[in-house]
A protein has these predicted regions:
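Acidic/glycine-enriched connector segments
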Residues: 5-158
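Short, small-residue-biased leader/transition segments that mark boundaries at the very start
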Residues: 1-3
Length: 158
């Protein structure tokens, strides 16, 4: 399972944290054990934190941090840098896809997430975004996408 958000930090403000935790727990109860996070600010980090919070009570649950390039958090706020570092330190595994930033590195990260996912959980608002690309690619490959933005705005998931 992979976790993705729309790239603008203000898109995700924590309003679905409760649903997010419930979804992660439900996926674990369905047999999912490996949760991949793209490590972007916002929903990616919130989802990673939900996995870490549940890991103690969910046997076998693991967080895989998928980092597009070393130095990803350099442009983050100080608070987000600390949050990122905490998640990265606590992750069970880290996959760093490139030594430095290059054009297309975020798409390669998104491709990696989809290529290693059976299901995608996203906070998807805008079609023209990295998350939009990820969602379209997942759906094209027949991978189920749970869009918590839609579920939060029209709560029929639970």
């Amino acid at each position: 399972m992979c976790i993705r958000d729309s790239p603008l930090i203000q898109d995700y403000d924590g309003r679905a944290d409760g649903i997010l935790r419930a979804v992660v727990y439900r996926l674990w109860s369905e047999g999912f054990r490996f949760f991949l996070s793209g490590m972007a600010c916002g929903f990616d980090l919130a989802a990673a934190e939900a996995v870490l919070a549940l890991r103690g009570e969910c046997a076998g649950m693991e967080l895989v941090a998928v980092v597009p390039f070393a130095g990803q958090p350099e442009s983050f706020s100080d608070a987000d840098k600390r949050r990122y570092a905490d998640v990265l330190t606590a992750a069970d595994r880290t996959v760093v896809l490139a030594d430095s930033y290059s054009r297309g590195c975020y798409y390669r990260r998104n491709d990696y997430l989809v290529d290693h996912a059976v299901r995608v959980v996203a906070w998807y608002i805008r079609r023209n975004s990295g998350t939009g690309y990820t969602v379209r690619r997942a759906r094209h490959q027949g991978i189920e996408v749970l869009n918590l933005y839609e579920d939060k705005m029209n709560p029929t998931l639970f």
